[in-house]
Amino acid sequence: MRIAIVGTGISGMVAAHLLCQNHDVVVFEANDYIGGHTNTIDVELNGANYPVDTGFIVFNEDTYPNFVKLMMKLGVAWQPSNMSFSVQSEKTDLEYCPTTLNSLISQIRNLLRPSIYSMLVESFRFRREAQEILRANDYETTLGAYLEGKGYSQTFIHHFIIPMGEAIWSADPKQFNEFPAHSFVQFFNNHGFLNVKDQPQWQVIKGGSRTYVEPLTRSYKDNVRLSCPVVSIKRHPDN
């Protein structure tokens, strides 16, 4: 069978990897490189070269079991990574990292900001209360409506929840008020972000995430059409 696959993101690459064994597969990619969200660039610093991932960065063995199996099959190695969260806002001149007390008060003025302490209290409250969305199976309420309805402060919303969402989804902050609250909370719950303790150990691919692209695409690389965006897809009655 002749099969066309659109995109060389992880889904497209895996689909082509499996299907090309028994079918004639052609992959169409709009970018000029293979990998989609998987993109590693080399950064030179003080004479040393460092691979930096700009898209897919981390995973963990608890919530990415199929990805782990794939990496094992491909013979790709990974290693533990530290993961932290920090915020810097030029507009409000606020900077903090809630990991430790010292990083929280990285700006001395934070000691005199009651909003910082209130925001931390609200973060614990959100972790506790957000589970109710999952229990209620509420798929309609938006994140903005939920936070407003629960009376969360603008400081918590704009300097904690939205920046964290931006970091995870690389999305425009203006979109998050309309983001489904259930999807947001479910992702947080699945990845241990609602827990203060017992969070999963995050891992990174040695040498950058590009390391798995070559072995994953080796069997069909010559059938990838780069810089070839798909304009339309038509379904024919006989197919």
What is the meaning of each model-derived region?
Residues 186-238:
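Helical element adjacent to the flavin cofactor pocket in flavoenzyme catalytic cores
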Residues 26, 79, 223-227:
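General small-molecule cofactor/ligand-binding pocket signal
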Residues 41-67:
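N-terminal glycine-rich dinucleotide-binding loop that anchors FAD/FMN and/or NAD(P) in oxidoreductases
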Residues 20-44:
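Glycine-rich FAD pyrophosphate-binding loop
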Residues 2-27:
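N-terminal Rossmann-like FAD-binding beta1-loop-alpha1 element of flavoenzymes
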Residues 61-181, 185-186:
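Mobile amphipathic helical/loop "lid" adjacent to a hydrophobic cofactor/ligand pocket
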Residues 37, 181, 205, 209:
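Conserved donor sugar-nucleotide recognition element shared by glycan-biosynthetic enzymes
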